[in-house]
Each structure stands twice: as C-alpha cells, then as structure tokens.
C-alpha cells in the first residue's frame, strides 16, 4: 500500500499514473509516497532534511525528484536516488527499473523545491489529461472535468505527443482523432493533422 500526501490534485493523479506503470506492478517495492513541500526552506535546509530522512529509514531506498542543481550537491547522502526533473519519462523508467530489483523496500519521496524549480515532466493539466485518457474519459468529459474550452483541450492533446515514444504517440493520436472529429469542427481536424506532422 502507498499514500500520496499532497493538496495538488493534478500532481496526485500524475503520480498515480506513474505508479501504475509496469515497473510498479509488484507493490511491495513501493512502501509509501510522501510529497514534501519545502518552499519555506533554504537550500542548505533541504540537504539537511534529506539526510534526516535517510537516517530515519535506513532499510529503504529513497527517490527524490529535483533539479540537477541539487543532484550534484556535495551533501547528497549515499543510497538516496535522484531523478532529474528535466529528464524524460523514458530515463525515469530506466532508473526505476534498476531500483525495482533492490532487496529493500522502496520509499519514493517526490520533493518539490517550490519557488526554485518546477517539475517540467509533470506539467499540470497535461498529466491529468493522460490520466483521463487511460481511464476512458470522452473528449467532452475531459473538457468538463478540467473546466476548459474544446479548442484549449485540442492544443493540449496535440502537444502531448512530444511526451512519448512513437508507439504511445500513435495510440494517443488515434484517440484524439476518434474522439474529437466526431464532436468537433473540421478546423480542429486540420489543426491536429498539422500537429501530428510536427510532433510525431
């Protein structure tokens, strides 16, 4: 079992989607998840906090999402793993696959250095859209859920093809065509065709 402590709905859904990837099929490797909001800490306080967390959970591996500026910090404790927020999801998966075979439990801490960096891979609404697609939401249902207009959603969907390797991009594009063309104007169809040419 795991828990996600965050007030950000977008972030929660995005992380839930990450956990449902194949590398986390066996939940015993995922002990718990906590999101630490350190917006009130200084950089040196962040390093101290990491060390304290490591000392408290010696039997578990800990993963932090943060900027490479902190990854190269001299204060980086041993056996605490870092995922660069500027890396691709493919690189994240490669690192997570290695950690899956560790004997100890896996504690994942998503660390936000608020006001200093932002997690570019988990860009808010785009990750929620991915979650909605996987849950089988229709185009109209996603529009209502996010409280945005149809054209805005089309723009989001077109940009999402840059987030994935080709096989998933193709299936995402098929979803867009199947769900948007039936309920949208020809103008959207032209827009999506152009986006596919550039993004996929």
From Swiss-Prot:
It comes from the Bacteria. GO terms for cellular component: membrane. Its main location: membrane. It is a single-pass membrane protein. The chain crosses the membrane at residues 104-124. Keywords: Membrane, Plasmid, Transmembrane, Transmembrane helix. This is Uncharacterized membrane protein YuaF. It comes from Escherichia coli (strain K12). The lineage of its organism: Bacteria, Pseudomonadati, Pseudomonadota, Gammaproteobacteria, Enterobacterales. The gene is yuaF.
């Amino acid at each position: 079992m795991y828990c996600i402590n965050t007030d950000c709905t977008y972030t929660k859904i995005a992380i839930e989607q990450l956990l449902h990837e194949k590398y986390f099929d066996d939940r015993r490797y995922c002990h718990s998840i906590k999101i630490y909001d350190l917006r009130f800490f200084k950089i040196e306080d962040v390093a101290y906090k990491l060390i304290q967390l490591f000392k408290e959970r010696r039997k578990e591996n800990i993963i932090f999402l943060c900027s490479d500026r902190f990854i190269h910090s001299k204060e980086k404790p041993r056996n605490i793993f870092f995922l660069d927020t500027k890396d691709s999801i493919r690189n994240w998966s490669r690192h997570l696959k290695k950690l899956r075979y560790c004997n100890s439990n896996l504690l994942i801490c998503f660390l936000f250095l608020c006001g200093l960096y932002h997690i570019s891979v988990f860009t808010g609404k785009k990750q929620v859209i991915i979650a909605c697609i996987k849950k089988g939401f229709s185009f109209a249902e996603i529009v209502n859920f996010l409280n945005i207009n149809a054209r805005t959603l089309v723009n989001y969907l077109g940009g999402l093809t840059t987030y994935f390797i080709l096989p998933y991009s193709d299936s995402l594009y098929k979803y867009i065509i199947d769900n948007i063309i039936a309920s949208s104007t020809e103008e959207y169809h032209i827009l999506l065709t152009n986006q596919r040419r550039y993004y996929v």
